[in-house]
A protein has these predicted regions:
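A short acidic, Gly/Pro-enriched loop at the edge of an enzyme's catalytic core
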Residues: 104-112
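Conserved alpha-helix/loop element of class I SAM-dependent methyltransferases that forms part
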Residues: 25-43
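C-terminal alpha-helical "lid/dimerization" subdomain adjacent to the S-adenosyl-L-methionine
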Residues: 148-204
């Protein structure tokens, strides 16, 4: 969903528009995620954002909850720079950390979110990452995860969902050949898990009260408690 570290994402407005074209209801996803975090994060709470490059969720969360402090983690210096450009002067309550979950502060955090990121990780690394997030959260703290998650069996259903995703992109104005090429790239590069597998990983990592709150073609989103 996000550009690779070697790719210049462009100016903040065009980057935001490009991501929104690929993720159905992106703005509403950010709003819903903020609402779910706010059910348990206090007014002056500390929130961990994993995969914070680009800054879109940081912008949405910090505007809605100016009292929160955010630690944003991302491996790409290019995408962290993009987040800084997007946020402008609104970074007083945001600390960036270049790296992965092991480079994040130990916490404890009052909440955490990882949007459009976990689908890049294979099963074992995804589980390890989720456990590391869980370890950094206060007991009962909310965690939001949203990413590509759809049936991955051999009965043709994965291709059906990918075709539906491509059809949505074409309906939004993307060239059909480009949309279909994107599907092939996803099939080759993304170690996508099924929703049931994603939920099992959250539970295995120590989370409880796992609830689906967002479903948009190939994308799913959950809220869980540490």
């Amino acid at each position: 969903v996000t550009p690779s570290p070697a790719t210049d994402p462009g100016d903040p407005a065009s980057y935001a528009a490009r991501v929104a074209r690929h993720v159905p209801g992106l703005r509403d996803l950010h709003v819903m995620a903020g609402i779910l975090l706010a059910e348990h994060v206090p007014d002056q709470g500390r929130v961990l954002i994993l995969g914070a490059g680009g800054g879109l969720e940081l912008q949405a969360f910090s505007r809605a909850h100016p009292g929160w402090h955010f630690d944003g983690v991302d491996p790409s210096p290019t995408m962290i720079a993009q987040a800084r450009r997007l946020l402008g002067s609104d970074t007083a309550n945001i600390t960036f950390h270049q790296g992965y979950i092991d480079d994040a502060p130990e916490g404890p955090f009052d909440g955490a979110a990882c949007l459009l990121t976990l689908h890049f990780l294979r099963h074992d690394e995804r589980l390890r990452t989720l456990r590391a997030v869980h370890r950094r959260l206060s007991p009962g703290a909310p965690f939001i995860a949203a990413h590509h998650s759809f049936p991955a069996g051999g009965d043709g259903e994965p291709d059906l969902w990918l075709r539906r995703n491509a059809a949505w992109l074409v309906a939004g104005g993307m060239d059909e050949a480009q949309a279909l090429a994107g599907i092939e790239t996803m099939k080759e590069r993304l170690p996508v898990l099924s929703p049931a597998e994603d939920e099992r990983l959250l539970i295995e990592a120590g989370f409880h009260d796992v609830q689906l709150f967002y479903a948009a073609l190939t994308f799913k989103g959950w809220v869980a408690r540490a």
